[in-house]
Amino acid sequence: MDKVYILVLLLMIIPILICIKYAGKVKSEVASSIVKCLVLMIITILSNGVFVLSDNQLFSYVMEGLYLFSFDVLLIYILQYSQQYTQVFSEVTLFRTGCFVVAGLDGISLLLNVFFHHVFTLKAENYISFQMYHISDKTIFYYLHYGFSYCLMFCIIASFLTKIVQISDFYRKKYVPILGVFCVIVILNIVCNISEFPLDISLLFFVFASILICYLTLYRSPKELIDKTLSIVVAGMNNAVICF
């Protein structure tokens, strides 16, 4: 079971590493944000994966805290990416700094939880003859953590929805798939959180998200978009000739 699970983790991480390689070749702010998102995806996947495999309670506390913290920071960078990609709102440095401060304080709280258990406690249970720790008792600090996370998720979804509403159909192909897979991640994350299942199933869709983000943002322009752009250029040239 352990070997199969480790193999699954590797199969998830390898495509993301390939995306990091290709995104790193593009010199732009949005490409830089994508690389940061992808690196944090790997940290989030590994921390949750190691948490599931761990049979040591203290180490499980550390890994679950790292997973929750890295997910926070990942969402902040996805929000930064969505701002740069959709351009439906201007980047507010004070807001971004505030998000990092809140995430940092949350990270410190999660680290202290290893010793004081003031955010959540862990309990060992058997899942299909396999013992795993899962979050048992939750405090107000745990709900505040997820309240912050879901606020970031809402902002990300809102930015993509706003962009999709504002643009024509042939532009939407660069935004709808990313929004779709992100919504799946959000829904599965909520389901896993409510059910207290140790393994975050939503992480499986990080692979699809990383590929879509890199491909649609950095490497692909829809054929209709290219045709439309060329038609505008040709029309402009014709108008210029007529005026001349």
Question: What are the residue ranges of the model-derived segments?
Answer:
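Hydrophobic transmembrane alpha-helical segments in integral membrane proteins
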Residues: 1-15, 138-150
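Membrane-interface helix-boundary motifs at transmembrane edges
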Residues: 21-34, 57, 83-95, 161-174, ...
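Sensory modules in modular signal-transduction proteins
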Residues: 220-244
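Alpha-helical transmembrane segments in multipass membrane proteins, preferentially the mid-helix core
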Residues: 15-21, 77-81, 146-169, 214-220
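Hydrophobic alpha-helical transmembrane segments of multi-pass membrane proteins
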Residues: 4-55, 63-80, 99-116, 178-194
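Interfacial "cap-and-anchor" motif at the non-cytosolic start of specific transmembrane alpha-helices
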Residues: 2, 24, 167-229
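Non-cytosolic membrane-interface motifs at loop->transmembrane helix junctions
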Residues: 57-68, 198-206
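Hydrophobic transmembrane alpha-helices
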Residues: 43-51, 105-129, 140-198
